[in-house]
């Protein structure tokens, strides 16, 4: 044995028990080395006899190489007994990790080193794997339902995303050009939602303000959309406290501004609602008045047409009656004038009934009548009656 192979590990083997209860069969092991024999380890009658055997494999390698290689036939399987472990893990005496071979079914198998059993087991395992591969190749690939569902959902999601991208940007591949599109878009779309404090100190007079972009460390309040710049030496001590105070001031101002804007919007909303209410009420009142005016106009028009028709129907009779009354009045007036002219006023005695005296001066009475006639002649009524008389005279003449 060379100096490289002189490293040995001590392996403890436990005796294998087979057969009925109480019956024990000692495991015999033979060491292929000339200097070691079985007699040095066997010969003790204790049930729990443990033998220390030298092996050229470590315990870890022994556990990894411990595989089941059973070459018994079906009859030997039936006669072997029921004490074999059902988990499929072989005992140490049945494995090929010992120097003397394996003890299976009462027969000692030679060692795996340099034997043909190793080649036969490898050949059998290769044939078994070929058989499994042939069975797997014989099965036809079937498309299952969940495959169809997954493919259809992926296709629908892709189509909807492309349609949405096209409707928003007009370009189907706009989402895949994010890096270039972000550089080309306006800076306001990127940083317009955040109030950067150091942006005010930037040179706002030049046109480069539109190209401004934040850089460095910022203390950001995402609730109020405020960002305050921080340097590397401003994170501790008084400057950090100052930064917190500035952030608190901007946060409070933003909240007050937000609350004020909300209140103003609420007031403006109430005022707009009141204005709309008054406007709608005025429009409704105006519409109702317009409808009422149309109805009243229609009614008065009907009444006027009715009165006009009645007037045209009764106007000849009224005209005749008026003419007849005018003629009678003229006749009465002319007759009264004649009677007044022919009247001879005699001395009138006082009426005893009324106990008052009437003047005996007849000339004064005549003067009063003449004066009354002159007044009547120059009155409007007399002029109207004279005009009617002239018209009637001309009508009768013609």
Swiss-Prot record:
Annotated segments matching region Disordered: 15-50
Membrane topology summary: Single-pass membrane protein
Keyword Transcription regulation: no
One CC-aspect GO term: phagophore assembly site membrane
Keywords: Autophagy, Endoplasmic reticulum, Membrane, Transmembrane, Transmembrane helix
Induction profile: Expression is increased by rapamycin, which mimics nitrogen starvation by inactivating the TORC1 complex.
Motif (ATG8-binding): 8-11
GO molecular function: protein-macromolecule adaptor activity
Effect of deleting the gene: Partially blocks reticulophagy, and the double ATG39/ATG40 knockout almost completely blocks this pathway. Leads to abnormal morphology in the nucleus/pnER, when exposed to prolonged nitrogen starvation.
Compartment(s) where it occurs, according to its Swiss-Prot or TrEMBL record: Endoplasmic reticulum membrane; Preautophagosomal structure membrane
Transmembrane segments: 148-164
Location of the motif ATG11-binding: 52-59
Any single biological process term in GO: cellular response to nitrogen starvation
Main localization of the protein described in the UniProt heading: endoplasmic reticulum
Top-level taxon of the source organism: Eukaryota
Its biological purpose: Acts as a receptor for reticulophagy and nucleophagy. Directs autophagic sequestration of double-membrane vesicles derived from the nuclear envelope and perinuclear endoplasmic reticulum (pnER) into autophagosomes. Is not required for the cytoplasm-to-vacuole targeting pathway, mitophagy, pexophagy, and non-selective autophagy.
Quaternary state and interactors: Interacts with ATG8 and ATG11.
Protein name as it appears in the record: Autophagy-related protein 39
Organism whose genome encodes this protein: Saccharomyces cerevisiae (strain ATCC 204508 / S288c) (Baker's yeast)
